From Swiss-Prot:
It comes from Escherichia phage Mu (Bacteriophage Mu). Residues 444-493 are annotated as: LysM-like. Keywords: DNA end degradation evasion by virus, DNA-binding, Host cytoplasm, Host-virus interaction, Inhibition of host innate immune response by virus, Late protein, Viral genome circularization, Viral immunoevasion, Viral release from host cell, Viral tail assembly, Virion, Virus entry into host cell. This is DNA circularization protein N. It holds the Pfam family DNA_circ_N. Residues 339-353 have a biased composition (Low complexity). LysM-like fold region might interact with peptidoglycan to facilitate DNA ejection. It is found in: Virion; Host cytoplasm. One of its GO terms (biological process) is symbiont-mediated evasion of DNA end degradation by host. GO terms for molecular function: DNA binding. Induction: Expressed in the late phase of the viral replicative cycle. Expression of late genes is activated by the viral late transcription activator C. Disruption phenotype: No tail is synthesized. Residues 407-426 bind DNA. The lineage of its organism: Viruses, Duplodnaviria, Heunggongvirae, Uroviricota, Caudoviricetes.
Length: 495
């Protein structure tokens, strides 16, 4: 009887081809069972719907892949009712056991699973037959989180390694030149020009005791150029130390713009001495002078690009901190002045409102019927961060990647293999850091207003929040936040 029933079960599978390569038998935790009826698998993506009141727009966020569930039908069949009951009990105990277990299934193969639910059915007139429906999920293989590189800390460390390598390159490649010759004059002019560029960058940082000290050091260096050009180690140490001093003077906001300016200046100097393929194009007759000047301009450009990449990473850290502070900041309007009577209802037309990008003052009615000025202050946005949206990060990442690629190619063409390797590692870290952490910033969208609206109303219409209306006005170059022109494309940062 048992063999007849098993053959009948397998005959159904054979009609559809399901039993040609499988036996129709399986095990769970080494407890055998027979596979019958349908076997199901389900999966998909974990989507979260974003729907807002009074808005016809919305969307979904993809939170990743769902775990694949497997549901299969099994049975215990035996010619002896007591034996069938014992075998069914053993399978129930295996399904109830804690932890994961090995499932051997003719369709699913051998997989390590955990049981989500199971159901057993039997009939009073068929005590030798037990039908099961079991749902399982794949067990977790990794019991610890994946290790990730702290890119925000790795970028400054790699920047130190790059600048050290650049200093070694300058001191090892530099050749002495004879005093009083045209070659010496050309080299001194090149070094003096580099010092002047650094001095201009420092001069733009303001007037403080630290800035004055660095300016004094640069002036002393400029006065001793004649001796420095024949002391390669001292020259390299002085120039790299000056760049390090500039980096230490800048805060996270001014650092990125400062290194942008320096990189552009050094880029022009480098382009004037080396062609696209690294061919020296200077007009000097001395090969030594040509080589020295080309190496000097390459080292200064590579160092500036290195510090700019480090500044971008630090600016992103500051932007994320700023975003977290703004999320936790109080959002209530603040009264600029005590609530005093400044007029009557009939004199409301004489009151005025002062509008700036940093502050919006509106007239409010006091409890006694007078008027007072209410200020919606842009707390913390007087000095906005360098990066405010994912689009800012994408543009900066592309710019830094292209700039570092150019410097890496120059290093390879001139035979500076150590510099090339260090710069390549820096580029990989910077791009990974900006792309990974930059996703935490808000996204930006482009919209057209149907009509002229105040910035607060326009921002609320597209985001449901008008707290950062000053940012909308600033980033779109709107001089009067009360009048955002309709029909014009504006950038909206949607948090």
């Amino acid at each position: 009887m048992f063999e007849d029933a098993l053959n009948a079960v397998n005959a159904v599978r054979d009609k559809t081809g399901g039993g040609r390569k499988t036996t129709g038998k399986g095990t769970f935790r080494n407890v055998p069972f027979l596979v019958i009826e349908e076997q199901k698998q389900a999966g998909g993506r974990r989507l979260v719907k974003r729907e807002y009141p009074l808005r016809d727009t919305g969307g979904v966020n993809d939170l990743g892949k769902k775990l694949r569930s497997r549901t299969f039908s099994a049975c215990i069949l035996n010619s002896n009712a007591e034996t069938a009951r014992d075998e069914a009990g053993a399978l129930m105990d295996a399904l109830d056991a804690p932890g994961s277990g090995e499932l051997v299934h003719p369709d699913f193969g051998t997989v390590d699973v955990m049981v989500d639910s199971w159901e057993c059915r039997t009939k009073a007139d068929e005590l030798n037959y037990y039908a099961f429906t079991v749902t399982v999920y794949p067990s977790l293989q990794d019991t610890a989180p994946d290790a990730e590189t702290d890119t925000s800390a790795a970028v400054p460390a790699q920047a130190v390694a790059v600048t050290g390598s650049l200093g070694d390159t300058l001191s090892s490649v530099w050749q002495t030149v004879k005093d009083g010759t045209a070659a010496a004059t050309a080299v001194m002019e090149a070094v003096t020009g580099v010092i002047d560029d650094i001095s201009d960058a420092v001069d733009n940082l303001g007037v403080t005791q630290t800035v004055s000290g660095l300016m004094g050091s640069l002036s002393a260096m400029k006065g001793s150029v004649t001796s420095l050009i024949n002391q390669p180690a001292m020259l390299a140490s002085s120039l790299m130390g000056a760049l390090s001093g500039v980096s230490s003077l800048c805060d996270t906001r001014t650092a990125f713009s400062t290194w942008n300016r320096l990189a552009q200046r050094f880029e022009r100097r480098h382009a004037a001495t080396a062609g696209r393929q690294g061919t020296i194009t200077t007009s000097y007759n001395s090969p030594v002078a040509e080589k020295n000047i080309a190496t000097l301009n390459y080292v200064m450009l590579a160092a500036a690009q290195t510090y700019r990449a480090e500044a971008a990473s630090q600016a992103l850290t500051a932007a994320l901190d700023f975003s977290r502070r703004m999320d936790n900041a109080a959002r209530a309007p603040v009264l600029d002045a005590p609530s005093t009577t400044t007029g009557t209802a009939s004199g409301a037309s004489s009151t005025s409102a002062t509008v700036t990008q940093g502050q919006l003052q509106l007239t409010a009615i006091t409890p006694d019927g007078g008027f007072s000025q209410v200020s919606f202050s842009d707390s913390g946005t007087a000095t906005p961060p360098v990066f405010e949206s994912v689009s800012d990060i994408e543009k900066t990442t592309a710019m830094l990647g292209a700039a570092l690629d150019s410097v890496i190619l120059t290093a390879s063409e001139q035979g500076f293999s150590t510099d090339s390797v260090q710069l390549t590692q820096l580029r990989l870290l910077v791009v990974a850091d900006l792309e990974k952490r930059g996703l935490q910033l808000a996204g930006s969208e482009s919209h057209h207003l149907p009509e002229t609206l105040p910035a607060m109303v326009a921002l609320y219409r597209f985001t449901g929040n008008s707290r950062n209306w000053q940012r909308l006005a600033r980033r779109n170059g709107i001089s009067n936040p009360l009048f955002v022109p309709g029909g014009v494309s504006i950038e909206v940062i949607n948090e």
